[in-house]
A protein has these predicted regions:
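Conserved beta-strand-loop-alpha-helix junction that forms the acyl-donor binding cleft
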Residues: 134-143, 168-178, 196-197, 207
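Conserved beta-hairpin
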Residues: 58-74
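Conserved N-terminal entry element of GNAT/NAT acetyltransferase domains
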Residues: 1-14, 22
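Conserved acetyl-CoA-binding loop-helix of GNAT-fold acetyltransferases
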Residues: 138, 144-157, 182
């Protein structure tokens, strides 16, 4: 199986959104906040599309393809990346994310994402030449076939070529954590995230020196 790695084209944005939505539909990061599958699907499609539009050209979107089909996608932010302003998100249609879904569910998820990503952002800003992977997905039917590990190796080369010395990311899945550790990332922070129903979700932040 030949894998082609590259940079996402603007005309491929919707394809990346659809891929990520399929992969994220069973991820604790979303299922805990959007228990209804129909609402979860709607939010995932809308949220990722609007975020992609807002961030396009401001960060690094990487892909892996097999026979021309996109099978993996990642957003990797360099140390100079600045999150777009609220106005920029609004101008790219962010308010449409709330259309037809429970506003509280979206706001609870956004609050969780800020808290869960904080250790990585703090670590990135405290050091130098550290890149942050804010999103990574592999097409479900292509998981456990070695594509994810090869995709990470591609990021590492991509980051090194641009002067990066470390990468960091977080996950809320034990399965994903085991995968990242197998690929050389080490835990530097772990904490519980309080869920709206009073339960807790574990969050692990990991890093790797390149």
């Amino acid at each position: 199986m030949e894998i082609e790695f590259g940079i996402l084209g603007r005309d491929e944005l919707m394809e990346s959104v659809e891929l990520a939505t399929r992969a994220y539909m069973t991820y604790e990061y979303f299922t805990n906040f959007f228990p209804d599958p129909k609402e979860r699907y709607k939010v995932l499609m809308s949220m990722q599309y609007r975020a992609g539009l807002t961030n396009f050209g401001k960060t690094h979107f990487l892909t892996a393809k097999v026979d021309g089909k996109m099978v993996a996608f990642a957003q990797i932010d360099n140390p100079q990346y600045k999150r777009p302003s609220v106005l920029q998100f609004v101008l790219h249609g962010w308010l449409l994310v709330y259309l037809g879904v429970k506003i509280k569910h979206v706001n609870d998820w956004l609050a969780m994402d800020t808290l869960a990503s904080k250790p990585c952002h703090d670590y990135q800003h405290a050091g130098s030449d550290i890149w942050y992977t804010s999103s990574v997905t592999v097409e479900p039917e292509y998981q456990r076939k070695g594509i994810g590990s090869k995709f990470i190796a591609f990021w590492e080369d991509y980051i090194r070529e641009r002067g990066g010395k470390e990468l960091t990311l977080f996950t809320n899945s034990e399965k994903n954590l085991a995968f990242y550790r197998k690929n050389g990332l080490e835990i530097f922070d772990e904490r519980d995230i309080l869920l709206p129903d009073g339960n807790k979700m574990r969050s692990w932040s990991v890093k790797k020196t390149l």
